[in-house]
């Protein structure tokens, strides 16, 4: 318990250096922090979701958080998680022992933080809600506080220095989480899940960050067109030179055939 109070302020300071937090609906949380048992049921997006919610709850009584047993395999991580109130739970085998322990702690007025989806969602949308949170709340006679954690990044996921909005909704009274008719237990659990889902969706609809504008594409810088190679001009077609009429040469005068006259026959 002493280590919890030593580590919690240190983690609070470090987290507020690396991220920007905004808490809405803190009055709903305070309305159940009066020694009564209560369960915080939150959506789950990032591994650090429980840490962020824990430092904003900042209760003088330690908040218990069920966490999958794989996270405790690393000795240092397991020690830190244990100091911060995490309790190992075997999700695949129906760990009734841990559920009973959490129920007893909740009955004593200790808050329990549960992620009803049972795992993180990659899309940011609510997954299928499991029954563990409702079983603990019903057995402990606890009120249930819906909690929505919203990341103000373009993809809705956690990034360094992004804005984080944690919204606490109006508590669901313990009386509405009791199953009086065991023959209709499944129908009663379905009704509770639908009620919680509607509350969580409404918290998102009323407190979502405005959509960030898509990054404008810079206009492409037009490269100067390469100078076109000069096109060799085709030689002009050679016009045929008109034939000059060749003047006819005057025909040479025909020489008169000179027929040698026979000499006069000599007179006999």
Language-model segments: what does each one mean?
Residues 25, 42, 67-68, 85, ...:
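A secondary-structure boundary/capping signal
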Residues 14-20, 42-43, 88-92, 123-124:
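Short, flexible loop segments at the rims of nucleotide/cofactor-binding pockets, characterized by
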Residues 20-24, 93-98:
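Glycine-rich, highly charged phosphate/nucleotide-binding loops
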Residues 1-28, 59, 75-84:
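A transmembrane-helix-recognition feature enriched in membrane-embedded lipid enzymes
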Residues 32-93:
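Catalytic core of membrane glycerolipid acyltransferases/transacylases, capturing the structured
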Residues 97-235, 240-243, 248-268:
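Non-catalytic C-terminal accessory region of glycerolipid acyltransferases
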Residues 28-33, 103-104:
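Short amphipathic alpha-helix with an adjacent loop that forms part of the alpha/beta core around
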Residues 14, 83-88, 116-119:
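Short, basic, glycine/proline-bearing loop/turn elements
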């Amino acid at each position: 318990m002493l280590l919890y109070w030593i580590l919690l302020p240190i983690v609070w300071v470090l987290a507020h250096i690396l991220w920007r937090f905004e808490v809405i609906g803190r009055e709903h949380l305070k309305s159940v922090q009066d020694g009564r048992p209560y369960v915080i049921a939150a959506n789950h997006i990032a591994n650090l979701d429980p840490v962020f919610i824990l430092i904003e709850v900042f209760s003088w009584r330690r908040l218990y958080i069920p966490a999958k047993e794989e996270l405790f395999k690393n000795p240092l991580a397991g020690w830190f998680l244990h100091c911060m109130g995490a309790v190992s739970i075997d999700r695949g085998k129906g760990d009734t022992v841990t559920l009973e322990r959490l129920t007893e702690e909740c009955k004593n007025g200790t808050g329990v933080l549960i992620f009803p989806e049972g795992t993180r969602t990659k899309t940011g949308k609510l997954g299928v809600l499991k029954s563990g949170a409702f079983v603990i709340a019903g057995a402990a006679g606890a009120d249930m506080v819906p909690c929505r954690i919203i990341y103000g990044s373009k993809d809705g996921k956690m990034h360094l220095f992004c804005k984080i909005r944690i919204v606490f909704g109006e508590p669901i009274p313990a009386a509405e989480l009791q199953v009086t008719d065991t023959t209709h237990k499944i129908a009663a659990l379905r009704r509770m899940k639908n009620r919680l889902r509607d509350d969580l969706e409404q918290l998102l609809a009323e407190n979502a960050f405005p959509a960030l504008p898509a990054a404008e594409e810079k206009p492409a810088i037009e490269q100067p067109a390469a100078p076109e190679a000069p096109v060799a001009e085709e030689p002009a077609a050679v016009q045929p030179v008109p034939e000059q009429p060749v003047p006819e040469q005057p025909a040479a005068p025909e020489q008169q055939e000179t027929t040698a006259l026979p000499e006069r026959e000599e007179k006999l």
